[in-house]
């Protein structure tokens, strides 16, 4: 089990699309926005390279002024991003998982940005 920086975005966008949301829906949206804000990952980006086996690979490297990212999975207790191979064992550094899973899965995304942007508009609409 985990929190998700990818699947959660569409759920929150759906909730914000509801006309006349109930107090519970508003509370859920506000809670989700706080989570997206506290879960932002800044200062890293993908760098592609050819690994020692001659395969295309990537690693996360520091960067300035790069887009904010969210991890695919966050630990339920610590909110720390984690990654895993097909065995499901949590790893806290993407370089610790195998090439196949690292390159065959979307571990980082920018989807939270559209949620936060839409939230600003939604909040204004709610205050009318």
Language-model segments: which ranges?
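Intrinsic, low-complexity N-terminal interaction/targeting segments
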Residues: 1-2
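Terminal, non-catalytic domain-edge segments
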Residues: 6-128
């Amino acid at each position: 089990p985990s929190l998700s920086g990818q699947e959660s975005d569409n759920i929150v966008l759906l909730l914000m699309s509801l006309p006349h949301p109930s107090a519970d829906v508003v509370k859920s949206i506000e809670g989700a926005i706080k989570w997206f804000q506290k879960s932002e990952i800044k200062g890293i980006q993908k760098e592609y390279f050819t690994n020692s086996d001659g395969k295309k690979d990537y690693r996360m490297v520091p960067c300035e002024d790069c887009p904010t990212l969210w991890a695919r999975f966050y630990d339920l207790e610590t909110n720390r991003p984690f990654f895993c191979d097909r065995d499901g064992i949590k790893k806290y550094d993407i370089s610790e998982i195998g090439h196949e899973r690292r390159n065959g899965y979307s571990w980082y995304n920018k989807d939270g940005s559209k949620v936060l942007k839409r939230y600003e508009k939604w909040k204004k609409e709610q205050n009318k």
